[in-house]
Amino acid sequence: MATPASAPDTRALVADFVGYKLRQKGYVCGAGPGEGPAADPLHQAMRAAGDEFETRFRRTFSDLAAQLHVTPGSAQQRFTQVSDELFQGGPNWGRLVAFFVFGAALCAESVNKEMEPLVGQVQEWMVAYLETRLADWIHSSGGWAEFTALYGDGALEEARRLREGNWASVRTVLTGAVALGALVTVGAFFASK
């Protein structure tokens, strides 16, 4: 389980990544997390891995957040459903990157649909999910230092060859998550009739 000392690291990583992705999409102005080049090697590694993920899976992943039809009342449930589906086959670094990209996409969709207060909430859900459901796996897999070694500072090319299987399984999981989101939406629609 996460130690209290890891909470600021996790929180800072989530805030930096979400801020970075929102700025890439032109949603955030001014100084804040994700502004400019990342000084922390972990933040640099997560940004690079997230960019690579989006490049590889743009077609599969591009509209996932929009397809979930998130509202303030359904956002946390949808976030948890997709996150649980993503890690159903067990965690790996590729799925962890997908989790960060999904969280940032959900934040961008919230801003796009004028639900900005959800951005902070989604970040809190990401931190809580990481610290309650993934902390043991992260620790047993070498911690964030191992992630940084795999994805950071020039290691991305080498890591790409090592993790090809991780990315392929992420595509399957994301397709299932989209289908799950669609089924939940259709089920809720018919239940309201």
Curated annotation (Swiss-Prot):
Q: Name one GO biological process term.
A: intrinsic apoptotic signaling pathway in response to DNA damage
* Location (main, coarse): mitochondrion
| Keyword set, alphabetical order | Acetylation, Apoptosis, Membrane, Mitochondrion
Domain of life, per the record? Eukaryota
Per the UniProt entry, the signal peptide is none
Which InterPro entries is this protein grouped with? Apop_reg_BclW, Bcl-2-like_sf, Bcl-2_BH1-3, Bcl-2_fam, Bcl2-like, Bcl2_BH1_motif_CS, Bcl2_BH2_motif_CS, Bcl2_BH4
Residue numbers of motif BH1? 85-104
Binding partners and assembly: Interacts with HIF3A (via C-terminus domain). Interacts with BOP.
Q: What's the record's remark on domains? A: The BH4 motif seems to be involved in the anti-apoptotic function.
| Name by which UniProt lists this protein | Bcl-2-like protein 2
Source organism: Bos taurus (Bovine)
